Amino acid sequence: MELRDSIRSFPTAPGVYLMRDATGTILYVGKARNLRQRVSNYFGATDGRPQVRFLMARVTSIEFTITDTEKEALLLENTLIKQHQPRYNLNLKDDKTFFSLRIDLTERFPRFTVVRKVSRDGARYFGPYASASAAREVLRQLQRMFPLRHYPLKTCLNRSRPCLYHQIGQCSAPCHNLITAEEYNLLVEGAVLFLEGKNKDLVSGFRQRMKEAAEGLHYEEAARWRDLLKAIDTTLEHQKMVSQGGDSDILGLAGNEDSLAIAVLFVRGGSLSGSTVLHGSGGLDTSDTLATFIQYYYGNERFIPDELLLPLSLDAGQSLEEWLSELKGKKVRLQQPKRGDKLNLVNLATRNAQAALAEKSATRQGIERTLAELQQKLALPRLPRRIECYDISTLQGRHSVGSGVAFLDGLPDKERYRRYRIRESQGQDDFGMLQEVFARRFSPERIEQWGLPDLVVVDGGIGQLNSTLSVLAELGLSERPAVVSLAKSRVKGDGKDIHVERTEERVFLPGRRNPVRLRQDSAPLKLLAAIRDEAHRFAIGYHRRLRDRETLRSALREIPGVGPKLERLLLTRFGSLEGIQNATVEELATVAGVSQELARLIKA
């Protein structure tokens, strides 16, 4: 029976379908309100999208799973896409970490902290912010207006007197009873209203408090409310309002045959607070693509706003609304604006997506030219899309480490960066260290997982190249990657001339005595140098971390009163020696057995 004929027996119920090729590999996962109708559409002559043609030319079988509701189909589809990562489904690249402000209102004297992830823990989260510095700047602004505590409560209660922030007016010192719990909670409510964009409620409430304090002849309290109102007014002057309060995310979508871009504008409290763009590939239908994006993006412990403004309507819109509302714990709306300010915001998000896609396409074309030129200049058997570079870092044979970095299509592929702690080679045995690193990278298990790179770059001249080739030969690989070495430029002459000249960087190839000389300003050489320098940076960073860790560990044990047990307690509390080093005296003093005096010795 032909595949087209088998579709006639599909049910008309909601569910999920999986398309497989002749090897059984899942090519695409989709959901449907009506399985038979949805899958039949792929065989229609009217669908001329290239992605659909490419997909259907490879599909040899289609399976389905019936679900009770469309929402269940939505959730199952999301699970299967994450599990199998099919080639023709949306594949997003999101290397950006967002930050939020968190406050637990059930805590005694609540305080705001900057966090990386939004957890379902009952606390309030505000954001997201594109960087830690942006989140901290908002927090500093908030603390100037609302003098809430800065430190963990245990640290505050262990202090003998109020902290420095109290002295400069940025902490109300609740730990020393310099403010009542009721007054402190009013400050917390004000800070929350400010972050929610409910500035009219905030200002009117504080003005009423100031008036009541003045009428009751509590002039110091009235002055505090007055100063607080001035700080709020000053801040609000610099905020541009784009909507009538509330939190919204505005999505814009742009795509071509090869890739797509989705822009997200963040409106918090009625003000545009930031934006991000995610790039990806795959996806057959714009409605399905946007629905998949929403599941990926907001299901990954993100802040969920009150509403999402979309450039198009979604077939699974109602199911997505229910799912988002369950995650948030309150109603979330999906809207496709038709007119007015909200439509203008969606158009702005779409223009951001289009601009990002155009920039990405131009960059991609430049990278393709660079890789093609590199292949031609170095006589490589194939286009060097995946390039790996390895470096060794050691100091007189101590703390020896290796590093491996990977570039994919001219850009860092940090998921495949690896650090290697040298365990077997001793002393200054660079050959042995490289052999140990390559034995781990090019083990059968790792080759099966990652495959071979198109090109391996090593730092050095012909000697380093020959050593690398010998190591690879000893590993007995059935297939070997292409290998070149890149020798750094050197200062010409004795270096005493005021006009310093340098030799060219040279690329050594196997079986060739003289190096290839690339123009110093050429894109291929810049790419090779960037990869080599990144491997060196990565190795040096790891080497220094190990060296500093041992130095700090030795220094800790030399402090009177710090033994192995207390060292373990400190490591448990702060996670690492770096964490101990970065902790404040007050935070160190929260560890059992650490007095204020000992904490100061540790910080000294």
From Swiss-Prot:
GO BP annotations, alphabetical order: nucleotide-excision repair; SOS response
PROSITE patterns: GIY_YIG (PS50164), UVR (PS50151), UVRC (PS50165)
Organism encoding this protein: Trichlorobacter lovleyi (strain ATCC BAA-1151 / DSM 17278 / SZ)
Alphabetized UniProt keyword annotations: Cytoplasm, DNA damage, DNA excision, DNA repair, Excision nuclease, SOS response
Function: The UvrABC repair system catalyzes the recognition and processing of DNA lesions. UvrC both incises the 5' and 3' sides of the lesion. The N-terminal half is responsible for the 3' incision and the C-terminal half is responsible for the 5' incision.
Assembly with partners or alone: Interacts with UvrB in an incision complex.
Gene Ontology cellular-component terms listed: cytoplasm; excinuclease repair complex
Family, similarity comment: Belongs to the UvrC family.
Protein's name according to its UniProt entry: UvrABC system protein C
One Pfam family from the record: GIY-YIG
Domain GIY-YIG residues, every copy: 12-90
Coiled coil: none
Keyword rRNA-binding part of the UniProt annotation: no
GO MF annotations in UniProt: DNA binding; excinuclease ABC activity
InterPro entries, A to Z: GIY-YIG_endonuc (IPR000305), GIY-YIG_endonuc_sf (IPR035901), GIY-YIG_UvrC_Cho (IPR047296), RuvA_2-like (IPR010994), UVR_dom (IPR001943), UVR_dom_sf (IPR036876), UvrABC_protein_C (IPR050066), UvrC (IPR004791)
CDD domains from the UniProt entry: GIY-YIG_UvrC_Cho
